[in-house]
Regions:
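Polytopic transmembrane helical bundles with strong interfacial aromatic enrichment
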Residues: 1-384
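Short active-site neighborhood of thiol/selenol oxidoreductases, capturing the structured segment around
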Residues: 295, 528-555
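Electrostatic cytochrome c docking/interface patches
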Residues: 392-415
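Periplasmic/extracellular electron-transfer cofactor-ligation site
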Residues: 406-407, 417-440, 465-473, 493-498
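Typically the conserved alpha-helix immediately C-terminal to a functionally engaged Cys/Sec
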Residues: 430-434, 546-561
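Extracytoplasmic electron-transfer domains, predominantly the class I c-type cytochrome c fold
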Residues: 437-495
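N-proximal helix/coil linker or "cap" segments that precede and/or mark the start of modular domains
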Residues: 488-518
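Short, internal strand/loop/helix patches
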Residues: 568-571, 579-607
Length: 608
């Protein structure tokens, strides 16, 4: 069923893109160029007939594939076979009660007047031709509401949808115009008239201008779509969606290279001296035909990938399985190496683009020099980049399924006591009862290096073990949520130990993050995370029995809090003292709490 849906999407997108391209080539490229070259518009009568039949074929394919797409969606939603989805009314429900059905009806309502335009006698560049172009473009643009862009909420969704819409239109103006351009070149070759060389040059230059504008829009729209649907390197290389997106980008780059050869090497030949040999003109036209066919094949590959991508969850909504044994942690670098890497990255990009352009133009010596510059940038960049290389695992970029909150920490404490204390010890310092008999001492889970690893790294070790089996994996013992609970407890306890080592002086170093927790003050309930959304918070955590002397000191410091912006409300333990920023809490924590500390923006900033 999924393959059927993908095939229907591919055919429908292809038909809509190519249908727009037929009218765009007529109205924006062929006839304006013919008029400018001084040739008689009637000389393209044969091309007009062929383009008309081509438009009918694409319109029929759009209608047929759209109907199949509707049935496939109805079958997928209802869980029925294709025939049953059609005969038992599932398709009618999708058509009348879903957004997909509304968009489908819009496209097919546009197909009717478009067919009427094809039936009418169209003059080159006349009003009917322009009307047909607008109708076909509207059909193509409406497909944006059938993609992921329509599901993004808010203003971001408006931006995403607009980018998707422009992306589709640009595809119609570039990829869609390739088959008509090929037909035009075939017509030029068929005539055998050298006077057509000027017409071919005018059409090709105008087509190149349209292609450059379309590619610019495609690049901008593609960047926006990638940001919303992948957005991160792990999502690009570690998910099925991201890897398919990279395939699409690779095919697109190949199209750009072929187009660059046409623009920089072949088009100038057509616009050369008037006494250029006939063989040179026809040889150039033949090469343009071949390259246009290659571009078309690559473009259809891009559309095929789009057909699959629309059936997959975006990379940002999928757990990425990191495929490499290492990763880059740029945060480990100081400012100087970061600036150097940024400069080298820009230089490498410029060298790469210039080298491709020089190769396409046939300037191979210049391309070799630029390739050497690219290699030099990469070699020099390796030196400052080495400290940022870290060991990585398939789960390195996993997001925890359990929130980093007090409830999860408490559950993890019980699991840790049952499964981990024997080796790591009750305090987590690697001094459990069995530690002395092990050839490698268990890791100290309270040291600062714990925070150098991502939660996904910890998840891999807890799941699959480490040190060649000395630490066993817990895949068959704890379910994924339980493993995340254990990790949250380990992180919380290490944060508490680290907070206890902080002196009275403020530092610029990153402080460990405090887990979220719920609180109640009178009739008001909330969480630390919710409160932090309203501004900085001064948080004091303690365990029973309450540190009475310390609480008195804090009460005496109320004037300092007032000076910092807090309201002058005094409270008792367990209540907020200060209604405005910075808020101060005196909050009893669970039995596996941090040491007493202050929290600013979610992190311990100074021991109390």
């Amino acid at each position: 069923m999924e393959g059927f849906l993908i095939a229907a999407r591919f055919l429908h997108f292809t038909a809509a893109i190519l249908l727009t391209g037929v009218f765009a080539f007529e109205c924006l490229v062929a006839y304006p160029a013919v008029r400018r070259s001084g040739a008689a518009p009637g000389s393209l009568a044969g091309l007009r007939r062929r383009l008309g039949w081509l438009a009918w074929a694409w319109l029929a394919l759009a209608i047929g594939s759209g109907a199949v797409w509707l049935v496939a969606v109805a079958a997928g939603i209802s869980g029925k076979p294709l025939g049953a989805a059609l005969s038992q009314g599932a398709a009618a429900v999708v058509l009348t009660r879903t957004r997909f059905g509304e968009d489908w009806l819009l496209r097919f309502s546009l197909a009717v007047p478009l067919g009427c335009c094809l039936l009418a006698s169209r003059r080159a560049g006349g009003a009917i031709g322009w009307a047909a172009l607008l109708l076909a473009a509207a059909m193509l643009a409406s497909l944006a509401w059938a993609g992921h862009g329509a599901s993004t909420p808010g203003l971001a969704g408006d931006l995403h949808l607009t980018a998707d819409l422009l992306h589709l239109l640009a595809a119609g103006l570039w990829l869609g115009t390739l088959p008509p351009f090929i037909l035009f070149l075939v017509e030029v070759s068929r005539t055998g008239d050298t006077n057509w060389g000027a017409v071919a040059a005018a059409v090709t230059r105008r087509y190149s201008t349209l292609a450059i504008a379309s590619v610019t829009v495609l690049l901008a729209g593609g960047l926006v779509n990638t940001w919303f649907l992948a957005g991160t390197v792990p999502a690009l290389v570690g998910t099925g969606y991201g890897r398919l997106l990279l395939v699409k980008i690779g095919l697109f780059i190949a199209m750009l290279i072929v187009a660059a050869v046409n623009l920089l090497r072949l088009v100038p030949r057509l616009g050369g001296p008037a006494d250029a040999t006939r063989n040179l003109i026809w040889r150039t036209v033949a090469q343009l035909q071949g390259n246009a066919r290659i571009e078309t094949a690559l473009g259809l590959g891009v559309v095929a990938v789009v057909g699959v991508l629309g059936t997959l969850p975006p990379g940002l909504h999928t757990e990425p399985a990191w495929p490499f044994p290492v990763r880059l942690d740029i945060g480990e670098l100081t400012l100087g190496p970061r600036i150097l890497l940024a400069i080298l990255a820009v230089a490498a990009l410029v060298c790469a683009i210039a080298a491709v352009a020089a190769t396409a133009a046939g300037r191979y010596r210049r391309a070799a020099v630029l390739a050497a510059g690219l290699a030099l940038c990469l070699a020099v960049g390796w030196i400052p980049l080495r400290p940022a290389i870290e060991r990585a695992y398939p789960t390195t970029y996993y997001a925890p399924t359990q929130p980093y909150a007090a409830a999860s920490v408490d559950r993890g404490a019980a699991l840790y006591a049952e499964d981990c204390t024997l080796c790591h010890g009750a305090t987590g310092r690697g001094n459990g009862p069995a530690a002395a008999g092990l050839p490698i001492r268990p890791a100290d889970l309270t040291e600062a290096h714990l925070f150098a690893h991502s939660p996904g790294d910890l998840f891999w070790w807890v799941s699959h073990g480490m040190d060649e089996g000395l630490m066993p994996g817990f895949v068959g013992i704890l379910n994924p949520d339980q493993r995340w609970d254990v990790i949250n407890f380990i992180r919380a306890r290490a944060a508490g130990v680290r907070a206890g080592q902080i002196g009275p002086d403020l530092t610029t170093g990153a402080a460990p993050e405090i887990p979220d927790f719920a609180f109640e003050t009178g009739r008001t309930q909330g969480t630390l995370r919710q409160t932090l959304e309203n501004g900085p918070v001064l948080l004091v955590l303690f365990t029973a029995p309450a540190p009475v002397e310390r609480l008195r000191q804090l009460a005496a410091a109320q004037s300092s809090l007032d000076a910092a912006g807090a309201a002058g409300n005094r409270g008792r333990a367990g209540r907020i003292i200060g209604g405005n920023r910075p808020r101060c809490w005196l909050a009893p924590f669970c039995r596996h709490s941090f040491v007493r500390g202050e929290c600013r923006a979610g992190a311990v900033s100074r021991a109390r």
